[in-house]
Amino acid sequence: TVAVGTSGVAAEQYTDFSQPELTPTIQQQNVVSAGDTHTFSVMIQNRHDGNTNMDRRLGGIATVVETHRITLGAASGVSAKFTDDGTPFEIKTGAQSIGTITAGNGKQTSLTVEVASDAEPGVYQVPVKLQYSYIQGINVDTGDYYINRDEETVTKHLNIRVEESVRLTVDTVQAEDLYKNADGTM
């Protein structure tokens, strides 16, 4: 996407050599058992290193950045979609709109999984498809400016561990002198 406008400044250029790097992580223990339904808190961090290149003066670029409320290094319009490919999980969370994540910061979202009752113990990777846009560059020339935006889709993974668990089922109970809500030995 390219935005075009007018500005009264000599040629200047901003180029961002590194796009935002989004990294999802589970914020608490990532352990579940077969048959469980669990909601995880997921932090999506923008680990953009802030490596930029400025050409000439900053004045015209600063004006464009301020006018359009641009945050350099930010991932904008971030969305996350979790999938259950190759896992014993049923993903109960739909695609989520996260918003803008500025460089060095993160935003919370959630992931709800239903674990298959016959899930084997082990560590499983849940794919997370992240879509976002970012400012790739700004060119300011006499009377004009160009904002170059790029869109990106990346797939990252969250590790979730299924622990071995014992599930007992009581089929029948026989006892004398038992009634509802009573205490006793069986």
Give the predicted meaning of each segment:
Residues 2-186:
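Long beta-sheet-rich domains in secretory-pathway and surface-associated proteins
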